[in-house]
């Protein structure tokens, strides 16, 4: 476990004896601060601007550059409205520190680790700095293993790697939030793990909706907050670029505590990883750096690497990260998504077409990919079943134009059989979710990987050709499908 430098308290009174400087220039969210000779703060140190006399001002900044002549350039994490030249600035002597541990569950924090949910202060004395080194190679768990989610379409066709990084692609209204909440629920029940959600530069309304839905579905337990399964960290669209650039690190730091100290499996959600890059680009321009390709910051790869390399499995536990990826103008060659792809182990693509058919989760079985789907990692049986499922669905996709023009009757006997099995597979890839029980009335189902493979093997073998396709819709394992078929006949 890594040891961290001492922390600073949130009260200015506790840092009265620290170095003091004063503001000499303000350009938007960027401040230049002069310090006495020989008392310069380090890069990434947190500075606190103290209001004059009775003014209650508490603006936190982070040192980004040492300019010479005893001056530093810092980026503000809060609005800089009301700041003036000459105001006193206190060097805390340490990077931004945030609360960590079980008391963070069920709470909402900002980039500085301050609770913003009006539920009072966080009951913890344990804090970590947000700038931490990635685990040393000797600490890493290099064994590749599957992270079972209990969601059939994910586990069979695009399995997640334990301690891996998954890109989540999908537009509005296709079920991203429900899928995220189901994963949070399943990791808590099946793996005894917890989750941290980092809202990076997205809409405040979306953050509020997610919080309300989590309370409604039981992921956040209002009556007993300590039984909640997730901690939320928000740095929304309206906040300064410094806050949006660092909020991902705040969420990651909270996740690292659960992995390194509590030795748990953790799910870390980042929504949206593109906004992290976008905020870095804004800060880079404000600091006067020469832009690189398409106007992005020259340090793009370094910034992305410093975040992504901390997301990994160690011998203590794992952080498995699911990152929503916005692709600007649908251009996959744009430097921001292209840099992100280099770090991903799997992609989960949500399809509007499947959502329109009522097949949930609307994960596209042909577009979703995973580097884990190899015979030596998942076994021959799993690999063969997944490939046959994809081949059947691909053939069905190719035949759809012919069916639309000529109808099913014009197909050969073999193709008709393929279509019938593909439609059953498509429906069997749907699944009732625990977090959707309150909306659908159907009890949620966690389906183990072994049960999933058996179910699809039976459909592909033709043993279930006599069952109606609606028997496979929104069920858990294959036994439930056969029971549903019996009920449909009676």
From Swiss-Prot:
Class in the EC hierarchy, top level: translocase
GO MF terms, alphabetically ordered: ATP binding; ATP hydrolysis activity; proton-transporting ATP synthase activity, rotational mechanism
InterPro entries the UniProt entry points to: AAA+_ATPase, ATP-synt_VA_C, ATP_synth_F1_bsu, ATPase_a/bsu_AS, ATPase_alpha/beta_chains, ATPase_F1/V1/A1_a/bsu_N, ATPase_F1/V1/A1_a/bsu_N_sf, ATPase_F1/V1/A1_a/bsu_nucl-bd
Stored SUPFAM superfamilies: C-terminal domain of alpha and beta subunits of F1 ATP synthase, N-terminal domain of alpha and beta subunits of F1 ATP synthase, P-loop containing nucleoside triphosphate hydrolases
Record's catalysed reaction(s): ATP + H2O + 4 H(+)(in) = ADP + phosphate + 5 H(+)(out)
Residues noted as binding ATP in the record, renumbered to the chain: 170-177
Keyword annotations of the record: ATP synthesis, ATP-binding, CF(1), Hydrogen ion transport, Ion transport, Membrane, Nucleotide-binding, Plastid, Thylakoid, Translocase, Transport
PROSITE patterns the record matches: ATPASE_ALPHA_BETA
UniProt GO BP: proton motive force-driven mitochondrial ATP synthesis
UniProt KW ATP-binding keyword: yes
GO cellular component, one term: chloroplast thylakoid membrane
Coiled coil: none
EC number: 7.1.2.2
Annotated localization: Plastid thylakoid membrane
Membrane topology, from the record: Peripheral membrane protein
Quaternary structure note: F-type ATPases have 2 components, CF(1) - the catalytic core - and CF(0) - the membrane proton channel. CF(1) has five subunits: alpha(3), beta(3), gamma(1), delta(1), epsilon(1). CF(0) has four main subunits: a(1), b(1), b'(1) and c(9-12).
Similarity comment: Belongs to the ATPase alpha/beta chains family.
Alphabetical list of NCBIfam families matching this protein: atpD
Function: Produces ATP from ADP in the presence of a proton gradient across the membrane. The catalytic sites are hosted primarily by the beta subunits.
Name under which the protein is recorded: ATP synthase subunit beta, plastid
């Amino acid at each position: 476990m890594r040891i961290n430098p001492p922390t600073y308290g949130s009260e200015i009174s506790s840092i009265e004896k620290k170095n003091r400087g004063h503001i000499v220039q303000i350009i938007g969210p960027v401040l230049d601060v002069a310090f006495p000779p020989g008392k310069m703060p380090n890069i990434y140190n947190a500075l606190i601007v103290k209001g004059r006399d009775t003014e209650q001002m508490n603006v936190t900044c982070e040192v980004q550059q040492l300019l010479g002549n005893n001056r530093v350039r810092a980026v503000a994490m809060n609005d800089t409205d009301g700041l003036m030249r000459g105001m006193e600035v206190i060097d805390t002597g340490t990077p931004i520190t945030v609360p960590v541990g079980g008391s963070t569950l069920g709470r909402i924090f900002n980039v500085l680790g301050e609770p913003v949910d009006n539920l009072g202060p966080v009951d913890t004395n344990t804090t970590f700095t947000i700038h931490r080194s990635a685990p040393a190679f000797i600490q890493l768990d290099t064994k590749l293993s599957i992270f079972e989610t209990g969601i059939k379409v994910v586990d069979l066709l695009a399995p997640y790697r334990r301690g891996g990084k998954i890109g989540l692609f999908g537009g509005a209204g296709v079920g991203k939030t429900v899928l995220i909440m189901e994963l949070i629920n399943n990791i808590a029940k099946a793996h005894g793990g917890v989750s941290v959600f980092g809202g990076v530069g997205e809409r405040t309304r979306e953050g509020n909706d997610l919080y309300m839905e989590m309370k409604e579905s039981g992921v956040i337990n209002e009556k007993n907050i300590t039984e909640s399964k997730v901690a939320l960290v928000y740095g929304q669209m309206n906040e300064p670029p410094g806050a949006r650039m660092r909020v991902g690190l705040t969420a990651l730091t909270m996740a690292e505590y659960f992995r390194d100290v509590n030795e748990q499996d953790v799910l870390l959600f980042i929504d949206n990883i593109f906004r992290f890059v976008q905020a870095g680009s804004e800060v880079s321009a404000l600091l006067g750096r020469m832009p690189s390709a398409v106007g992005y910051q020259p340090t793009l790869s370094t910034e992305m690497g410093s975040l992504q390399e901390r997301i990994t499995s160690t011998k203590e536990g794992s952080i498995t990260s699911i990152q929503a990826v916005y692709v600007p103008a649908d251009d996959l060659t744009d430097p921001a998504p292209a840099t992100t792809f280099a770090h991903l182990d799997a992609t989960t693509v949500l399809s509007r077409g499947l959502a329109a058919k009522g097949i949930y989760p609307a994960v596209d079985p042909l577009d979703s990919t995973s580097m884990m789907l190899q015979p030596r990692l998942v076994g021959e049986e799993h690999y063969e079943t997944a490939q046959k499922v994809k081949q059947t669905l691909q053939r069905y996709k190719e035949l759809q134009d012919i069916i639309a023009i000529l109808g099913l009757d014009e197909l050969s006997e073999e193709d008709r059989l393929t279509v019938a099995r593909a439609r059953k597979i498509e429906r069997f890839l749907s699944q009732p979710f625990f977090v959707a029980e309150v909306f659908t009335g159907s009890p949620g189902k966690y389906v183990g990987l072994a049960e999933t493979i058996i179910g699809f093997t039976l459909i592909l073998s033709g043993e279930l050709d006599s069952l109606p396709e609606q028997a496979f819709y929104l069920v858990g394992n294959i036994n439930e499908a056969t029971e549903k078929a019996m009920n449909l006949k009676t």
